[in-house]
A protein has these predicted regions:
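Central regulatory/effector-binding core of bacterial HTH transcription factors
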Residues: 43-106, 195
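Secondary-structure junction motif
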Residues: 128-130, 135-185, 252-254, 260, ...
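Short amphipathic alpha-helical coupling segments at ligand-binding clamshell hinges
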Residues: 13, 17-20, 62, 177-178, ...
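Hydrophobic hinge/microswitch elements
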Residues: 81-85, 90-94, 100, 171-227
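Short beta-strand-centered segments that line the small-molecule binding cleft or hinge
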Residues: 62-65, 83-139, 209, 229-231
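Alpha-helical linker/hinge and terminal dimerization helices associated
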Residues: 17-39, 270-273
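A late-sequence structural motif
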Residues: 58, 216-218, 228-273
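A short LG(V/I)-centered, amphipathic sequence patch enriched
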Residues: 1-12
């Protein structure tokens, strides 16, 4: 205060202090309003990622449901191969990814999304099918999960060892599992092409260019093709889980929580962090 003035007035420093205090209060109120909107999902952003298969067929209905429920949250979808997805998840560029590859449990939290099974897909024109009639499955059988029935027989891969195969390249979960399956079966296959995407191998099988190993997720998501015959594989590596991943010790935003709850209904009943 300036005691020499009449009436008593604030000094310039005092006036500056009051103005600064008012600005701080305004910022606090603005931040509280922003946090309130974040908690109510009236604002914010969420970045999710997956391989081409999951980005094309698994994420869209979840994203559509989320956007309808929370239209003010900006949701980004990134598509890429597993190493790139993990790189972006680690860097914080993605909040959540979906993948069937087991990531480092010391770095990432995971929640089980679904189970999928590997199948042998063979062009119907291949002669080897004649030796395996009782093991054959159609796409409609896969869609009603007949291959998951313990009483349905699995085929011996040796029946197809002389056929051409299209295969995924190394450093891929499907390829690693197939290598383990073939190793246990004691057979080597004739790989005519090596590719990067599971869907690409499937499409080449559709064109009769080679047999392939595909997930039942692919068969369930795509239109039925009578030119492909499917076979059940009896091996532990033929069954795998698909997970939602996010970085360990990362703050779980309300948008992340709600997205995970929509993707995995009922998860909040088993974990308090999603309540």
């Amino acid at each position: 205060m300036d005691g020499t003035a009449s009436p008593i007035q604030l000094t310039e420093c005092g006036k500056k202090y009051i103005k600064t205090a008012e600005k701080i209060m305004d910022l606090e109120n603005e931040f509280a309003y922003y946090v309130g909107n974040l908690q109510e999902l009236k604002t914010g952003r969420l970045s999710v990622g997956g391989t081409y298969l999951f980005s094309s067929f698994i994420f869209p209905p979840i994203i559509d449901k989320f956007r309808r429920a929370y239209p003010h949250v900006k949701l980004n979808l990134f598509e890429g191969h597993t190493p790139l997805l993990e790189q972006k998840l680690f860097a914080g560029e993605l909040d959540i990814i979906i993948d069937n590859y087991l990531l480092d449990a010391g770095i990432y939290e995971k929640e089980r999304f679904m189970e999928e099974r590997l199948l042998l897909a063979v062009p119907s024109s291949f002669d080897s099918n004649r030796r395996a009639v009782k093991y054959q499955l159609k796409a409609s059988d896969i869609k009603r999960c007949l291959h998951q029935n313990d009483t349905f027989p699995a085929v011996s891969l040796k029946k197809f060892k002389d056929e051409p195969f299209v295969m995924l390249r190394s450093h891929n979960d499907t390829r690693e599992r197939v290598d383990a399956i073939l190793g246990r079966a004691g057979i080597q296959l004739n790989y005519t092409l090596k590719l990067n995407q599971l869907l690409t191998t499937y499409h080449l099988t559709e064109y009769g260019m080679g047999a392939s190993f595909v997930s039942d997720t692919v068969v369930k998501c795509l239109p039925e093709n009578p030119d492909i015959i499917y076979y059940k594989i009896d091996d532990p590596e033929a069954v795998r889980d698909v997970y939602l991943y996010y970085k360990k010790n990362k703050y779980l935003t309300r948008s992340m929580i709600e997205f995970i709850k929509m993707a995995i209904p009922g998860i909040e009943k088993n974990s308090e962090k999603y309540v």
